[in-house]
Amino acid sequence: MMFLNDITIVITTFYSEKKVIECLKSINNKCKVIVVENSGSKKIKEKLESTYQNVDCILSKENMGYSKSNNLALKMVKTKYALVLNPDTILQKDTLENFLHACGSIKDFAILAPYIQTEEVKKHTKVPSNPIPAESVKGFAMFFNIKKFYEIGFFDENFFLYFEDIDLCRKVIKNNNKIFLLPSVKIDHKGAKSVELSDDKELEFNRNWHWMWSSFYYHKKHGGFLKAFIIFFPKLITTFAKFLIFTIFRHKNKSRIYLFRLSGLFNSMIGKKSWYRPKV
């Protein structure tokens, strides 16, 4: 028989105080929660730990990014299972129980995740009731069978943001482990709402830089440099062209966006690490 205290919840945050509090409100206090706060804010740590007795908040000395932060927490997990959540998620009352029910019926799995359907798809297809085998899942909610990761490890820490979930799923499948989507599990996800800062432009620059860096790195990792170069060289040219056009016509914000996209892609192509961090 499995219990809620068999699950540890892992949440990586960066100035996400309001969002993570809403998330924590939806989590049963029988579950241990590890929050990794990348801002280094002692105020956030004190507030979370004083409000929620089941929460340990780890402050990082630097902004480590999603992969490294999650790995730090996952290596501390002592329970059978871990649920990795984005801070902008809300669990429903039966979310954790439904995960545990699936653990009892699916004996051999590495990752479980909610089955997501858009409203348009729901109109035309019947929602399945049984677990669905999958090759990849969305990274906002990933339920880990911890023992399956002792040998293969968790996230690739070269990814700061984006593609780390797809990459991990690929590694899981390559090592003959199983991934399932669960129609019974419901988790609300707001999407792209994790960070609570007034400088939206800086966050947009950061997202664009890392999207391009991670895109090329992922394709290089799994297809080799030449294949990745063939795919992304046209994108390098078009990104540079758009940067020039927006610069000439003085669209400052769009010009900077494409400059950041260009920088992220170029740095990845020449083999530099994912070094950019939002200036906040």
Tell me what each language-model feature is.
Residues T13-N29:
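Short, well-formed alpha-helical segments that are part of the catalytic scaffolds
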Residues S60-V77:
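Glycine-rich, basic loop-to-helix element that forms the pyrophosphate-binding segment
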Residues A141-F144, K148-G153, N158-K186:
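A short, conserved alpha-helix in the catalytic core of glycosyltransferases
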Residues L182-E202, S215:
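Active-site donor/metal-binding and catalytic loop motifs
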Residues N206-S214, F225-V280:
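Non-catalytic, C-terminal membrane-associated alpha-helical segments of glycosyltransferases
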